[in-house]
Each structure stands twice: as C-alpha cells, then as structure tokens.
Amino acid sequence: MPRLLLVRHAEAAVQASGGDRERPLTARGWADAARLGVYLRESGLIPDAALTSPARRAQDTLAAILQELPPSRPFIAKVESSLYCADADTLLGLLPGPGQPIETLLIVG
C-alpha cells in the first residue's frame, strides 16, 4: 500500500540575512532531523521519493534525514516551489497518480 510521510522542517534560526526562505536549521534542528532519519530507517519507512519546499530549512531537514537512510533503489528528490506556504489542495495535487512506481513519498515543508 502506498505511504505518504509529511514532515515539517526542523527547528530553524529566527532570522537570516536572505529573508524567510534562507533561514538555516539550528544545531538542534540538524540533530532532530537526523534522529527522524534514524527513526524512519529503524521503522522500515524508507522513501522512494521526496519533495521539498525551496526554503533552506526544509531542504536542510531533508538532507539530514537522508543522511541516516540507506541508499535506496532509484531515488527521486525534487524541490517543489509550490510547497512554500502550501495548503491541503496543493499537497493533494502533488501526490503520484496510479501506476507511478512510488511506494513511499516523503514531503518536507
């Protein structure tokens, strides 16, 4: 059965010189995201594909998670600009359709 994993970015800095999209993760954020990667690995929730917001904090969260996961079969990672401030309808529109070879999709926003 296909699975959808929705993850909010880890703790980010309050401000960044490049504005909201450029806020990096804090040290705690990196550690928390890595722990989530360990949890996913130990739970057998290994994604086939991942979508992430263009926000730096979301991309960093995904990077920290992926560092803790085993290399997967062909893995698809994509920055999806519509994820920045996305609503439920936007998320639904990003889901793979029938017949697409994605068993577990991870979305980080």
Residues covered by each model-derived region:
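Short alpha-helix plus adjacent loop in nuclease-associated cores
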Residues: 83-95
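Short, flexible, glycine/charge-rich loop motifs used to bind or transfer phosphoryl groups or to couple energy/partner
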Residues: 40-41, 94-96
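Active-site-proximal alpha-helix that buttresses catalytic centers in soluble enzyme cores
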Residues: 2-81
